């Protein structure tokens, strides 16, 4: 039985929040398909959205533009809804090299990928929650528009067990094998089962904390129990249980056999086309590769690159949209697009890049034409499938504004009373020396500075110059991966250095209350990096500090500068009036620095017997580890944990289990 959403927060809606919540809920109840929440930095947009979710009690998907923001949102939602299902759905690849062919050098690049099994488990948990309950919030990246197993086939493959049902042991084991679970009587881990007499222990693929024990008497299920897979301690009995497939891509045997026949027909047709065009090498290559795949599918039920045959496996027609996470979201679900000015263009761009790579593979005989249907959703398909949508951004794009029409809800007033930064325009001629003196003032009072330049070269030269003149400075650029980026931002907040130089710092989306000055060099150069939207976003980076200030260096005031300054001053005036009316004294934000890397940890553990009662594991010694080293440490601790469990040293195993759990959350936050 699904519970209702229960919002946990010490705060009550304030400022513009109550009005924004009322208007959003009113719009949703009146059937509005699109609404935009225009909320300034630090106005509590996430809290507003959480209130809407709790009040309307509808399954919700939140789309974020990248894993970093998704992790931050997941942590915040976990804290708002500790008693409900808050799930995380991002790409499970630590590394991914798609197969490709370069005709100019006759080079074929094989597909190569490394799957993160912890994130895979969280993806499985997300789809299970969407299928089983209504109090669900799934925080997803644009990975949600990529093909996923067909929900109808996924549901058909599930194994339902109930107390008292008549089923023999061999049938259960056969069904578990069909779900791609493997038998392992020695090491009991996620996605495996073990058999001891008439007892079958199953470790569900979507869980990392508990397992199922099935006790049979002859051919009857006598008891179903949930137990701790490490200590073996029974937690409670259940009257029924559903075992979900180990992967989203599991397919019934009949469907595979049917798909094989359809693939053979397409292969014969394609061979004729290639031979008619005198493409003998391509014809031979295609025949050889496809026959090998068919043989593997016949023997094992799957093959390497089976996703290229997804059209046949899911029973779709040519050109039809692939099944995605959106197919798992109920019809009355709610979609929140966070930082929509970045996320919406991303959705539109995914399909085209994927298409051009696959067309080359098809043309040169590496894949059948049906492989083109293994793709992300097209933008039109996303629009058709998306449920009622709320776009959330400080600077909504043209698309959101057009779709929302007049339904744009402003959230400009901050409950904290914080004002938008003061803006000054200064001449370009002395910008570097002027900036250096401003940096020294901020460093002396333990505040931080962000500087944006137009080019990589300029950012590098400026970093060198500032460093030579005694400033503690770092440079953030596109070659630095997401994980290092989070570490750099964390070090900035901790005061390891005072100045961060970059080209496009506005898309980080992370809270940095310590930043009191944003300096925008060459602000009068019109273009993508100095557009009205970019300027407002960049100025907003200083909006979480009491002494927030933005300096725009330019010899003239461009149209974009004028609009950005005008909009910021309008918001500042509105906040000032609100503060005076209610006698509010602005308060700085005290967001803990660890929050960036935490995923709602206080509420991660359950409150049931034996699981929530132990103390929080101490993992402070691993905080400084790089992502690679952290992943290695998790593997080492897991190996030790299983060794302790096998030696019946359950206390030590449970201690390590808690450490592993904490480190996984840390790893996900920075992956």
UniProtKB/Swiss-Prot annotation:
Subcellular location, record wording: Cytoplasm
Predominant cellular place of this UniProt entry's protein: cytoplasm
Residue ranges occupied by any Helicase C-terminal domain in the UniProt entry: 431-593
UniProt domain Helicase ATP-binding: residue ranges: 26-183
InterPro entries membership: Helicase/UvrB_N, Helicase_ATP-bd, Helicase_C-like, P-loop_NTPase, UVR_dom, UVR_dom_sf, UvrB, UvrB_inter
Metal-binding listed as a keyword: no
Single annotated GO MF: DNA binding
Motif Beta-hairpin in this chain: 92-115
Entry keyword annotation includes Transmembrane helix: no
Protein purpose: The UvrABC repair system catalyzes the recognition and processing of DNA lesions. A damage recognition complex composed of 2 UvrA and 2 UvrB subunits scans DNA for abnormalities. Upon binding of the UvrA(2)B(2) complex to a putative damaged site, the DNA wraps around one UvrB monomer. DNA wrap is dependent on ATP binding by UvrB and probably causes local melting of the DNA helix, facilitating insertion of UvrB beta-hairpin between the DNA strands. Then UvrB probes one DNA strand for the presence of a lesion.
Family: Belongs to the UvrB family.
Protein name: UvrABC system protein B
